[in-house]
Amino acid sequence: MNDLDQLEKKIMDEIAEAGDEQTVEAVRVAALGKKGTVSEKLKTLGSMSPEERQVMGPAINGLKNRVTEALAARRAELRDIAIAARLEREKVDVTLPMPRPPAERGRIHPITQVIDEIAAIFGDLGFSIAEGPDIETDYYNFTALNFPEGHPAREMHDTFFFEPDEKGERKLLRTHTSPVQIRTMEAQKPPIRIVIPGKTYRSDSDATHTPMFHQLEGLVIDKTANVANMKWVLTEFCKAYFEVPSLNMRFRPSFFPFTEPSLEVDIQCDRSKPGEIRFGEGNDWLEILGCGMVHSNVLRHGGLDPDEYQGFAWGMGIDRIAMLKYGMPDLRAFFDADVRWLEHYGFRPLDLPTLFGGLSS
């Protein structure tokens, strides 16, 4: 037993003096390796009598376990020492100003910028933001919005349908954000004042259309909402968005299944210079959005009594009004992931649009 005590002391001293991982490994091999001192002791158990093995077996195995634990503890200690030394060597004074990057690459996409501008304008007018699912049912996308059977929008060439489920029902990618109007009417009681920015999907692709685009819709429901209120809201929005002090707008009769009466809105502009549009001046007109009083059938589908409540709604393409305001000629470039395009048309991340500080500073 004295031999084991002396051997243990020797090995433990070597472990304690080991100053790096390589030395610790050398001590391990010398003690526990195939021909190590502790391993050799274990080999002698086979030549001992049963009585001797009862005494020496636990003693030698206990030594092996203690050496193994000591080696692991020393390795962990050396790792902690190395980490502390590295932290001391590589420490950073966080009180010093950060050096400016050689080039500011990150930019906010124009669509994100325009949605933020829209939120700032309508937020100032007392509206809240509403959202809904991109994958919709036929009921919310068409039926509840007064689209009759056989309407062209229900055809495959205009709408992306999924395969029918086990019940024979087909989900679809929403063709407008109008389904959120129905969901909002179902979920809350009037008065309702919401705007709904979001992605929409239609089977169309050219310089001014893409299969996926962004749309803004608005909805106001209460007991006294009228066309005059709608004209005021839309005029104030267009003046704020295009950042002009005054703006003439023209409301023309139109048709949408979900509104009655339905109107299309043109805004005053000057297109006398090629490739340039100036709003709030000139003798030209440009169609900007569609609007109207919410159809009584839509109110009923939303769970409201049209004899008690009325409202107005409008919709416009976010991508299109972004192109008009910031002079971008091709809608398809919005989705090309070209960093050069984004550096040219994008916005600095910290320039958040506000009515007080300027929408597009």
UniProtKB/Swiss-Prot annotation:
GO terms for biological process: phenylalanyl-tRNA aminoacylation. One of its GO terms (cellular component) is cytoplasm. Keywords: Aminoacyl-tRNA synthetase, ATP-binding, Cytoplasm, Ligase, Magnesium, Metal-binding, Nucleotide-binding, Protein biosynthesis. One of its GO terms (molecular function) is ATP binding. It catalyses: tRNA(Phe) + L-phenylalanine + ATP = L-phenylalanyl-tRNA(Phe) + AMP + diphosphate + H(+). Its EC number is 6.1.1.20. Its main location: cytoplasm. Binds 2 magnesium ions per tetramer. Pfam families: Phe_tRNA-synt_N, tRNA-synt_2d. Mg(2+) binds at residue 260. It is an enzyme of class 6 (ligase). It is found in: Cytoplasm. Its cofactor is Mg(2+). HAMAP family: Phe_tRNA_synth_alpha1. Tetramer of two alpha and two beta subunits. Belongs to the class-II aminoacyl-tRNA synthetase family. Phe-tRNA synthetase alpha subunit type 1 subfamily. This is Phenylalanine--tRNA ligase alpha subunit. The lineage of its organism: Bacteria, Pseudomonadati, Pseudomonadota, Alphaproteobacteria, Hyphomicrobiales.
